[in-house]
Amino acid sequence: MNNLEEFLDISEEVKEALHEKKAVVALESTIISHGMPYPENVESALNSEKNIRENNAVPATIAIIKGRIKVGLNKEELEYMGSNKNIAKSSRRDLPVMLALKKDGATTVTTTMIGASLAGIKVFATGGIGGVHRYAQETFDISADLQELSKTNVAVVCAGAKSILDIGLTIEYLETFGIPVLGYKTENFPAFYTRESGYKVDYKIDTTKDIANILDTKWKLGLNGGVLVCNPIPEEYEMDKDYINKIIDETVKEARDKNISGKDVTPYILAKLHSVTENKSLKANKELVYNNCRVAANIAYDYSNLSR
C-alpha cells in the first residue's frame, strides 16, 4: 500500500472499516458529474450512501480530485463533483494523465474498479455497465468496462446494461473473457430501465451469501477478474419496454447523424431521455441505483463475514 500513497487518499472512515474487515461498497462519480443534473446528482449520491449505511456497510464514493484518487468523499467533495461543469469522464487510459497533471476526473465503472481494487474494496454498486455499442462492427466502440471486468477483482452490482447498447454482443463479450454473469433472484439479464432484455444471465442466485461465497471461491482459485451481479430495477419503477426502446432507438440514430461518438454518446442519450420522458427515466435511474446499493451492501457484509 505504501507505494500507492503518492496517488491515493482513503478517507478515515473507509480506512478504519477496511482495517477492521468491515463491509465497504465503492461508488462511482460519473453518475454525479455526467449522469444527472445538479443539485439532484448530489442529493442522489448522498441517498446512495445512506442506502449503503442502512444495510451494514460503509460507502466509498471514488473520484479524482486535483490529481488524487479519492476513496470516500466528504459532503464538500461530493458538492464539488456535482456542481463543477468542467470535470471529465476518466477511464483507464486517462488515469495516469489526470494524476500526473493534477486534474479532476469523474470515475467510470473502469476507474472506480481500479480505485476500489487499489484500496482493497471488493464490491462496487453502479447503475449499469458499459458494453458493446450498436454498430460496433463499424465503429469498434466497446466500453473499457468490459476489459476491466476481465482483469480486476471487484464485483460489480448493476441493473444490467442500457438498451442503447447491443446487449446480445455485450453478453457474448463477457462470456469470451470469462466474466461470470449472475442474476440476483432473476434468470433474466436486465436492461437498466426494464427488468428484462430478452437475454439470460449465466446463473440465477437467490441469496447474497451465495454470491459472497462465489466471489470468495473465484478469487481463492486465482481466477482474476470481476463478477457481474445483475439486479433488476424494482417493478414499481420499471418503464414500459416498447416506450423506452422507441425513444432510445430514435436517439441513437440522432447521435449517429450528428456524429456524436465515444464517451459523449451515453451522456447525450441520457439527457435526451430525461427530457423526453419528463424526468421519469431520471426517477427510474435513481431508484435502480439505490436498489443496487442495498444489494451490494448485503453482498459486502456477507463477504466481510467470510474473513472474520
Curated annotation (Swiss-Prot):
Which Pfam family, giving just one, matches this sequence?
Indigoidine_A
A GO cellular component annotation in the UniProt record: cytoplasm
Q: Which residues form the active site?
A: 28 (proton donor), 162 (nucleophile)
Instruction: List required co-factors.
Output: Mn(2+)
Looking at the keywords, is Zinc present? no
Q: What class of enzyme is it?
A: lyase
- Its domain of life? Bacteria
List, alphabetically, the Gene3D superfamilies matched.
Indigoidine synthase domain
Catalytic reaction(s) noted: D-ribose 5-phosphate + uracil = psi-UMP + H2O
Chain residues that bind substrate? 89, 109, 143-145
Q: How is the cofactor bound?
A: Binds 1 Mn(2+) ion per subunit.
Its keywords, alphabetically, are: Glycosidase, Hydrolase, Lyase, Manganese, Metal-binding
Entry binding sites for Mn(2+): 141
* GO terms of biological process kind: nucleobase catabolic process
Q: How does it assemble?
A: Homotrimer.
**What is the documented function of this protein?**
Catalyzes the reversible cleavage of pseudouridine 5'-phosphate (PsiMP) to ribose 5-phosphate and uracil. Functions biologically in the cleavage direction, as part of a pseudouridine degradation pathway.
Q: Which family does it belong to?
A: Belongs to the pseudouridine-5'-phosphate glycosidase family.
The name under which this protein is listed is Pseudouridine-5'-phosphate glycosidase
